[in-house]
Structure formats: structure tokens, C-alpha cells
Amino acid sequence: MAQFVREFKEEDYQDVLHIWDKTDMGGEHRGDDLKIIEDTINFGGKLFVLEDDDHGIIGTSWITNDQRRLYLHHFGILPDYQGKGLSHILMEKCMEFAMDEGLQIKLEVQRTNHTAKALYKKYGFKYLGDYDIYIVRNPEDINLDNL
């Protein structure tokens, strides 16, 4: 059983959605559809997939690029493959991409995900301090009348 990282191809889309569903990372219900993936890739990002020779795609890492920094998200591995050190294969590819681009790389992680936080720290990520992140996921929820 050998694993390797490669770039996303359109025919990977359903497998990627399956991983995102099984790892609670997102999917079409959060706007993570094929068009958005392709747009972010065309704008200098990458979607890497971790593939197993015997079992197909088992992990993903999506990197978007705003031309100032890279954003690492949707980094995850199917539960049956977690705890086997496979995240290092995927993370090394991400960090190589950041070095090649010469851009800083940033990510968000749930406070309770201690395993992921330990991995990120091993690769040099630093905690930025106590600040909260807010988002409006649905533009229809924007209400300027209350201002």
C-alpha cells in the first residue's frame, strides 16, 4: 500500500466531496463546488489529493492564493487512515508549494483539534494570538438596515 500526493483533476470531484463530508470540512452546501475549486486553482491555488494505490483518494489539502499569502484549508484524511503519519506526506507537499511560491501560508484550525494543531506546529506554524474569526456564509444574510 503506497501513498502519493498529486494535483486535483476534475474526475476527482466526487471523491473529494466524500472526504470533505466524512471529515466535516465542507462541500457544496458551503459553496465548495467544482467551479470554485477550478477558479481558485486558476488564480494560483492548488488542491492536492493524497492517493492510496489500493484505495483511491484518502485525503485533501486545498490552498488558495490571494497574491499576498496562501491559505491552507480542507486539510484532512479519511478517518480510517488517520493516525498513521500520512498527514506528513500531504503537509510536506503544501509546504513545498509555499516555499516555491515565496508566500507566507496561513490556516485556521478548530481550538479542540489538538492533533492538527500539533502537526501544524511541527511545520512551523505559529499561533497568532487571541482573536476570533467571523464569517457571513450567505450573502443574503447581510443586513445593512440595522446599522
Predicted regions and their residues:
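Short loop segments at secondary-structure junctions
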Residues: 52-55, 80-81, 137-141
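Conserved N-terminal entry element of GNAT/NAT acetyltransferase domains
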Residues: 1-11, 140-147
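Terminal substrate-recognition subdomain of acyl/acetyltransferases
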Residues: 122, 126, 133-147
